Regions:
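Tubulin/FtsZ superfamily GTPase core signature
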Residues: 1-329
Length: 329
C-alpha cells in the first residue's frame, strides 16, 4: 500500500518524520510525506523529511510562531492557504498513491484545527481514500487540550473516510520524562501503523504466500467511523543459529519468547493465540471490541511459520467476537 502522509502540527510532523525514517531504513519506498505547520521551529526540528517537504503556513497571521493552541485560528489559516498545501502535495507526485493519511495531535492548535479542513479538500480533489490518525492528549495536559480534541475529533470523523485514534492516556508510564514518553508513544504509532500501511507491498524477500493487499485494507475501512489497532509479536528462536526472528500479528503487539519451533497443530494454535493477545491486549484506543462492525487480521513472518489453518481459525475467532461479520485477512 503506497501512502502519502501529511503531518499537521508538531505531533503530526514528528510522527511522519519517523515514518519516513522507517521507510528509508527498510528501503521499501512505500511512504512519502510532507509536514505542515505554523511554527518554524517545529519544522526545523525534523530530521528525515526533506526541507522542500516542510511547509510553513500562516506567516502573515502568526509570523512563524504557531497559533498558540487556538484551533479556530489553525482552521482559518489552513483554509486561507489550502491551495498552497494542495500544490505542495501534488508536486510530490500522487499518481501511484493508494491513500492519503493525515496525522495530527488533536489537542493543539494547528493540527486539530487544520486537519478536518485539509481532509475535506483532499476528498474533493482526489479519488483515493483520506484517512486520519488523531492523537488524543492525556487529561493531565489540561482542559484546553481536551476541549480542542473533543471539538476537532467530532469534525474530523465526519470529514475523513476513516479515523484512527491513538490515546496517549492509555499508553503513559508513571515516572517517565516528557521527552521519553513522547518518543516512546510516537515509536508505538509508527510500529503499529507501519505494518498496516505496508500491506500488499513487495519486500526484498519477494511476494509472500498469503498476501493482504491494499484493496482489503481500504474495503475494511470503508464506511467511515473510528478505528483502533492492536499489535502482538511472538519471537521464533532458531535452534541452530540461536537467533530470534519476529512473527508479527498485524493489527497488534506484545513480546513473548518461545524456545521451540512449532509444527502442525501447534503452529495453528500459536497464530490463534497471537491474534487473541493482539485483540485482547492494549489497543491504540481502548474500547469494547465486541461492538466493532468490521475487522482485519494481518500476519507477517517467516513462511515456515505461516499456517493457513491457523490464519483461517484466527479470522473465525475475530468474527465470532465482534458485532459485524466482515473480517478480512
Amino acid at each position: 500500500m503506497r501512502v502519502f502522509f501529511i503531518g499537521f502540527g508538531q505531533a503530526g510532523g514528528k510522527v511522519v518524520d519517523m515514518f519516513i525514517e522507517q521507510d528509508k531504513r527498510m528501503q521499501t519506498q512505500s511512504f512519502r510525506g510532507i509536514a505542515v505547520n505554523t511554527a518554524r521551529t517545529d519544522l526545523m526540528g525534523l530530521k528525515h523529511i526533506e526541507l522542500k517537504d516542510r511547509l510553513l503556513i500562516g506567516q502573515t497571521v502568526v509570523k512563524g510562531h504557531g497559533v498558540g493552541t487556538d484551533n479556530v485560528t489553525g482552521a482559518r489559516v489552513t483554509a486561507d492557504e489550502i491551495d498552497s498545501i494542495i500544490n505542495a502535495i501534488d508536486s510530490r507526485g500522487t499518481h501511484d498513491v493508494d491513500a492519503f493519511v493525515i496525522i495530527a495531535g488533536l489537542g493543539g492548535g494547528t493540527g486539530s484545527g487544520g486537519s478536518p479542513v485539509l481532509a475535506r479538500h483532499l476528498k474533493r480533489i482526489y479519488r483515493e481514500p483520506v484517512y486520519a490518525i488523531g492523537i488524543l492528549p492525556a487529561p493531565e495536559e489540561g482542559r484546553l487540550y481536551s476541549y480542542n480534541a473533543a471539538r476537532s475529533l467530532s469534525t474530523l470523523v465526519n470529514e475523513a473516510d476513516n479515523t484512527f485514534i491513538f490515546d496517549n492516556s492509555a499508553w503513559k508510564n508513571e515516572g517517565e520524562s516528557v521527552k521519553d514518553a513522547y518518543n516512546r508513544l510516537n515509536d508505538e504509532i509508527v510500529r503499529r501503523f507501519g505494518v498496516l500501511f505496508r500491506a500488499g507491498e513487495v519486500g526484498k524477500a519477494g511476494v509472500g504466500e498469503m498476501v493482504v493487499d491494499s484493496s482489503e485494507v481500504i474495503n475494511t475501512l470503508r464506511g467511515g467511523g473510528i478505528s483502533t489497532v492492536g499489535y502482538a509479536i511472538s519471537e521464533k528462536v532458531n535452534p541452530r543459529a540461536k537467533q530470534s526472528k519476529g512473527l508479527l500479528s498485524g493489527l497488534m503487539r506484545k513480546k513473548e519468547k518461545t524456545e521451540e519451533v512449532l509444527t502442525g497443530e501447534d503452529k495453528s494454535a500459536k497464530i490463534i493465540a497471537l491474534v487473541r493477545r493482539a485483540m485482547l491486549g492494549r489497543l491504540t484506543l481502548p474500547c469494547d471490541y465486541s461492538t466493532a462492525e468490521r475487522g482485519l487480521v494481518l500476519l507477517a513472518g517467516p513462511p515456515d511459520e505461516m499456517d493457513r489453518k491457523g490464519v483461517e481459525k484466527s479470522k473465525s475467532w475475530v468474527e465470532e467476537n465482534i458485532a459485524g461479520v466482515e473480517v478480512r485477512g
